[in-house]
Amino acid sequence: MAAYGQISSGMTVDPQVLSSSRNIGVSLSPLRRTLIGAGVRSTSISLRQCSLSVRSIKISEDSRKPKAYAENGAFDVGVLDSSSYRLADSRTSSNDSRRKTKIVCTIGPSSSSREMIWKLAEAGMNVARLNMSHGDHASHQITIDLVKEYNSLFVDKAIAIMLDTKGPEVRSGDVPQPIFLEEGQEFNFTIKRGVSLKDTVSVNYDDFVNDVEVGDILLVDGGMMSLAVKSKTSDLVKCVVIDGGELQSRRHLNVRGKSATLPSITDKDWEDIKFGVDNQVDFYAVSFVKDAKVVHELKNYLKTCSADISVIVKIESADSIKNLPSIISACDGAMVARGDLGAELPIEEVPLLQEEIIRRCRSIHKPVIVATNMLESMINHPTPTRAEVSDIAIAVREGADAIMLSGETAHGKFPLKAVNVMHTVALRTEASLPVRTSASRTTAYKGHMGQMFAFHASIMANTLSSPLIVFTRTGSMAVLLSHYRPSATIFAFTNQRRIMQRLALYQGVMPIYMEFSDDAEDTYARSLKLLQDENMLKEGQHVTLVQSGSQPIWREESTHLIQVRKIKIGG
């Protein structure tokens, strides 16, 4: 195949390629990048200004300046500009009714049966979370085995497994019966083990007395109760109740504005992490990460184990906010754990911090989860509060990859209804979002060929209202496409089961397992047939095919391709 000229507004074209019009393909490189308008016909896309007829334009990274390669097809090229968003258009007009924001469900007594895991998966669960603060390895092993059994039955459905470490939590001890704390009452915490009296309970942290000071505010169970420290001895912290409530066993304790001087990864956490390595979980959610050193320590350990597990940091302490940039850079993704975050910091800061964490993660292509109290009332009630519905919508609008259910599915009375509510609210909110891309030109393509192609593929898919199909061995192009938030689904075909599992967390990505063929056309045809058989594509619909990277499906050298095809049933 010969090169016909550099990509520019004055690109030259071999006249022999003008005769065929089977497929549409274009390399969206520096052609002023203004997408003004498109009139879609069965064999071509009409854009303004200069005309180019090709089946596909492939960019080779072998030379410094991109070269255009053309074969078979028709395409009219106009001025292409990434700033031409259809801001006035909402996604309601799209034929794609699949939810793009992912749902993380915590598995517990209410949801650990085979039947319930199946039902949660069918209702919309994308990630099964194992909370290592509760249960033992035997119970979590059952959950892992059930999720893997479910995954083995499908090539187009993937439930990822997330192991959430307990972390260095300070908790109250066990109490035989709940203790009701009343405002103004004196109440004590002791570092002596096994104490459970009407006015004193033990804590699990020997340095608790040293960490707190007179005047500190203690928050119990994420702020459900609060106490002021009045005095302390060598083994006792004496408090007065400010906000009362029912104190149950093993409630979490925070000191407002302070983090406990505990290691971020405890001995128990290391045991749980090894358990995750043995079971090949997909994600670790690491609790109370204070700095990037913790992330590097865990990643180094995983490297020695040859374990391909992504590290999600939980941002939930005052220290994590101080070190946020370095922590986000070091991790593979983040969770906005609003419960403890709102306990250690003023609650009015939490919405702003949520927005900031989402923005930082999205700017460097890392997934972000919004968690805690999303549908808290549905633990005991069949319908959510209106504020909870708005909370879900805000997380979706801010661009979170996933939203999480904790007690709602772990021990709540209505786990399936909670998932259904989250699914419905997220889907409706997504339909109202403007059709656009969110990146600036400088981040779109400067110095990164893959980002450039993902950026322009998203623009093309938005303009044509077409789904994207990406073929990936590493998941990287699917992640880049997710970053630019195209309005339609990203069907990510991969021949790696681990990559399929990992992509389950990313916004807008539907991972599908499929063996790749040496024949690119065979791989294309099988992918389209699979989607047609599952009624995910319709007759006459256009799809945007994307391939980019060092391991393309049709040849060994690094190649990039964007191609548009029209679906013909049986053709």
Swiss-Prot record:
K(+) binds at residues 131, 133, 164-165. GO terms for molecular function: ATP binding; kinase activity; magnesium ion binding; potassium ion binding; pyruvate kinase activity. Disulfide bonds: none annotated. It catalyses: pyruvate + ATP = phosphoenolpyruvate + ADP + H(+). Pfam families: PK, PK_C. Its EC number is 2.7.1.40. Its cofactor is Mg(2+); K(+). Residues 1-55 form a transit peptide. GO terms for biological process: seed maturation. Keywords: ATP-binding, Chloroplast, Glycolysis, Kinase, Magnesium, Metal-binding, Nucleotide-binding, Plastid, Potassium, Pyruvate, Transferase, Transit peptide. ATP binds at residues 131-134, 171. This is Plastidial pyruvate kinase 3, chloroplastic.
